[in-house]
Amino acid sequence: SGDGSMSCATCHDPERWFQDGRAVAAGRKTLTRNTQALVDIGWSRWFGWGGAHDNLWSPSLRAITDPDEMAGSVESIAHLIRTDARYRCGVQQNFALDATAADDEALFVAIGKAIAAYLETLISGPSAFDAFRAALMDGDVTKASTYPAAAKRGLKLFVGHGRCHFCHFGAPDKRRVC
């Protein structure tokens, strides 16, 4: 953050599947939406609340510079990269950028892309729903019938009135890919 008191993990807590469990997020100010969970976010096509971004690195940078979230700046991030040997070395090794010579914007974008690369590694394991979906796709009625009735009611809400599936659609079924 701008004053060094917050990191991404302040709101995207690894112990809570990279979100904070709050109804609304608390950045530098109380925000209007909850903290998005980051597990499986790499499967998304659009990013950020409302889908304003078509890549994963851009909303990461927006959160860093948003005055209500982390209140950082391009210059403060570039300064951190230049003065911290770990970050300086990482940028040089992964982006072939000399942090001492690169302009602030190039360093800032490199950090956004590094964050995005990390986020793409946050992949959940198979869930009960994944097994249910696979059973349906395979036509295995017996296996599909083991999915709990309460979960089926939740699924109806999820894909029906709740309209949750427009943003929370999960990973594609990799078994069906050529």
What are these regions (language model features)?
Residues 1-178:
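Periplasmic c-type cytochrome electron-transfer domains
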